[in-house]
């Protein structure tokens, strides 16, 4: 009897096809494809330059994973150092942008939802063992302790940490080494402090102001 009732209910129930949700893939890198390709070219250019690779300002580690997997496939064996607060911008840097560079309160924010443990786990999940992560405020960390460096990607966004980092990282950049400075775009009102610091640094050292792929400033140390 119960089976008859079940069949009757099944016939009267509305027929609905349940389709699985399609997998939606979103691009999650902070660098555009040509910019990532350029960073890979920088790894090749500095392959034989003595020193480590450094990424100062690494956020959640997407770029670090990409570059380290490239290094693995291309057999570029160098230590890789990743530095970040892993908690967003420090209050002093934000205050400087507001008080000395005229930025409105609330404009400078982001990257707070992060932890060093998450970054380290991302490296492990991708089989990456060479990365040494350092949780620190760039303003307080002696960046010369990272040297010697063959290549450094500097991505700290704001004027105050960028200005200090440029001076110290260039000091320990090996001859023939390359420093890539992100956000060198004066039209980007949020991060234009990076471009100002880059302009001031290159002018003070008599180095060319060279920006490629829209926002990547280059500093080459003569061999």
Where are these regions (language model features)?
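Boundary detector for helix-to-coil junctions that initiate low-complexity/charged tails
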Residues: 1-10, 14
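S-adenosylmethionine/decaboxylated-SAM
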Residues: 16-33, 40, 47-223
């Amino acid at each position: 009897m119960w089976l008859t009732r079940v069949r009757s209910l099944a016939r009267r129930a509305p027929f609905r096809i349940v389709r699985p949700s399609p997998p939606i893939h979103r691009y999650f890198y902070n660098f555009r494809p040509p910019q990532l390709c350029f960073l890979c070219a920088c790894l090749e250019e500095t392959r034989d330059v003595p020193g480590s690779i450094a990424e100062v300002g690494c956020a959640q580690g997407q770029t670090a994973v990409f570059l380290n997997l490239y290094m693995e496939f291309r057999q570029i064996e160098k230590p890789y150092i990743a530095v970040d607060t892993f908690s967003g911008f420090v209050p002093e840097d934000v205050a400087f942008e507001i008080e000395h560079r005229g930025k409105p309160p609330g404009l400078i924010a982001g990257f707070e939802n992060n932890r060093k443990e998450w970054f380290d786990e991302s490296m492990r999940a991708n089989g990456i063992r060479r990365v040494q992560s350092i949780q620190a405020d760039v303003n307080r960390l002696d960046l010369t302790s990272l040297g010697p460096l063959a290549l450094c990607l500097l991505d700290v966004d704001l004027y105050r940490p960028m200005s200090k980092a440029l001076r110290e990282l260039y000091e320990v950049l090996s001859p023939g080494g390359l420093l890539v400075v992100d956000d060198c775009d004066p039209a980007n009102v949020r991060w234009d402090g990076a471009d100002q610091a880059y302009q001031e640094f290159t002018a003070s050292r008599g180095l060319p102001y060279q920006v490629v792929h829209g926002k990547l400033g280059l500093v080459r140390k003569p061999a």
